[in-house]
């Protein structure tokens, strides 16, 4: 396998990892939707008989479980993304015929990233719980029918929450991958003189125009990529120090 083939295979593996994680998130949200609809179906048909605190508590339990399970799932995948990002450097260097023994990555940054991601995922679940409470409240005061509330709640889970969760997962898994990749390259550069990195545009259907513009740009490992005519610099894709428009 050539260095280019090794890099292409690793990037494909990263994409598959992210897609598998978002699919897992979708399954968890669909299960939460089923459980919440079952709770609402068991409520009295006359909404005036609804005991709102009990309904809210039951739904909140479902969503707290969702948050914990989703956080656990993405945490495992984030670790895998971190390892894969580091392994890419090892594979490319080996494919070039260079034999090096590199130290284990310092995981302090990974630890912070894991805490951030699991916290964000749990926040998503709690935010949707509050939004659902608002929908139930509208029913109780007669502002909408139970049927309308059920439709709105399903939309919250299957559309808005899924979209937000997917954005977080894609961003943070890609960031873990790229961060580990950069750290590993810095280690390798200490023993492989002249090692350089290259910006490769993403495989998205609609990639950022500014990222497409620097496709193929090469820099020494310790130097940043230059975007927007020098107005923006990034050490790697999803660099947390870069403006949000370039990372989310």
Q: Whereabouts are the PLM-identified features?
A:
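Secretory-pathway/luminal and periplasmic proteins that interact with or process carbohydrate-rich
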Residues: 159-163, 178-179
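N-terminal leader/targeting and assembly helices and adjacent pre-domain segments
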Residues: 1-160
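Activation/maturation switch segments at domain boundaries
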Residues: 1-76, 171-248
């Amino acid at each position: 396998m050539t260095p280019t083939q090794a890099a292409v295979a690793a990037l494909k593996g990263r994409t598959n990892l992210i897609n598998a994680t978002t699919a897992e998130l979708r399954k968890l949200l669909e299960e939460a939707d089923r459980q919440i609809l079952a709770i609402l179906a068991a409520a009295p048909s006359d909404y005036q008989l609804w005991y709102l605190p009990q309904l809210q508590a039951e739904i909140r339990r479902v969503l707290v479980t969702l948050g914990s399970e989703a956080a656990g799932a993405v945490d495992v995948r984030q670790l895998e993304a971190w390892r894969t990002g580091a392994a890419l450097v090892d594979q490319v260097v080996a494919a070039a015929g260079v034999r090096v023994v590199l130290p284990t990555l310092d995981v302090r940054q990974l630890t912070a990233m894991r805490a951030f991601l699991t916290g964000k995922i749990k926040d998503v679940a709690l935010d949707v719980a509050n939004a659902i409470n608002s929908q139930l409240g509208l029913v109780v005061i007669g502002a909408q029918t139970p049927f309308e509330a059920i439709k709105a709640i399903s939309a919250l889970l299957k559309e808005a929450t899924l979209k937000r969760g997917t954005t977080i997962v894609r961003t943070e898994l890609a960031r873990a991958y790229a961060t580990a990749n950069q750290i590993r390259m810095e280690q390798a550069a200490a023993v492989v003189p002249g090692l350089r990195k290259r910006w490769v545009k993403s495989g998205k259907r609609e990639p950022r125009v500014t990222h497409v513009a620097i496709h193929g740009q090469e820099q020494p490992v310790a130097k940043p990529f230059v975007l927007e005519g020098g107005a923006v610099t990034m050490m790697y894709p999803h660099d947390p120090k870069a403006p949000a428009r370039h990372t989310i």
